[in-house]
């Protein structure tokens, strides 16, 4: 009955991954974006943790992308699965599956567990029906469908359904119990015992009076202890003020069996209240129908390791796709463009492990958050390949350099997480990891100074990254003098070319971009890699930012005059 655990995130549970740091997720804005997907912190954290795990295997990426496409396009399936998941989640959170099994549990507890198993069966049936009726194409969902069908048709599962059905039929016949109470000379309860377990309910008598009516009439007092199979009874409320304290009430107020009971007749402990009657009946029913209790325990023990846990483990995985699908669909309805990513497999495109073709891409934060640039989103194209490995990105301040740098990082996080990317198309070779070298917070640079902290952090990143990593640098080494910063930056780019990782380095040091040919020639002579660095610029339209990028030589000016004119701080504007 046992089978391999199924996952909608990992086609191969042994696949290797690297986890992005919290700093990287923050630098890319993914931590804030994940918070938009759910109001529940636990779900936010789960989604972010899934996205932070970077699997370089293109099979994992394609597996996820195909699943997400099914979820996004099948809204009814999405809604139905959410409803089923809520039911399964309730069983997991409040049911007894996650509790230790108590061998001393009474029949009522056992039947409650049986009801939970029955609810689980209904959930599996519902998932089976939902998947069978949906137009799904992904290997992940087709595999899940087969997995559920295997559970659905499994001999053990079918037997469980039969066992539960039979047990429910047996236990449903438990309608009432008949209790015998002995009285002493003072009409006090002297002993109580179970006479029978009945398949009929007792019904309220319209002609019997209270206890005194019973003892006042001789024909109401039986001459023996043989029950006459009369299912009429006189109910009472032990909490009602009007109830007279009678010997019968005392009997009902003290109905708990002592552990030393034998033969079905027990002495009554003092001080217990009528609320303990249920506990008493638990014990006497267990005693009288021990064969049924034994049977229920056998069934529960037999199926204690059934695939409930495996199915409940799918809940957060499905939730991951559903939450993203709901949010992406919401943004699509607002007019934002999204597309399914495609991962290159080994053997395709000459197995270029550095390939990336991005078309019409933009920063997801522009769609999620209201910013200065949100009203004017400019899509861009960018390529990486075996030759184009490093981009030195220059342009005006607030011209969009950081925005596009973040966007490229987001593309890989989203695509390798299976989620549609913001843009028209994205074909790529997955990265082993993403590393960001953005300006650190001031309080983190007190010991080493800002430049010292940047150097230490870059060295740690460089040592951990490999040729298939993605490195994103944002104004690195710009916190010191131009000469010092340029010297460190140039050596860093040379080292990056030596390792061969895909890199975007946005900077205001235009001289660094001018020197790419020199660095490329040096690398070619050393024959370290065939990758090269290229200058990339953010275009200007006069004094206006275009946010459009292009591979081109740096324009060679700092745009300080345009900024000064915009804010009125030129000499002429200040002294006029």
Which positions does each model-derived feature cover?
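Extended, charged coiled-coil "arm/hinge" scaffolds of SMC/Rad50-like chromosome-maintenance ATPases
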Residues: 270-301, 308, 315
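ATPase nucleotide-binding head domains, primarily ABC-like/P-loop NTPase cores
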Residues: 351-576
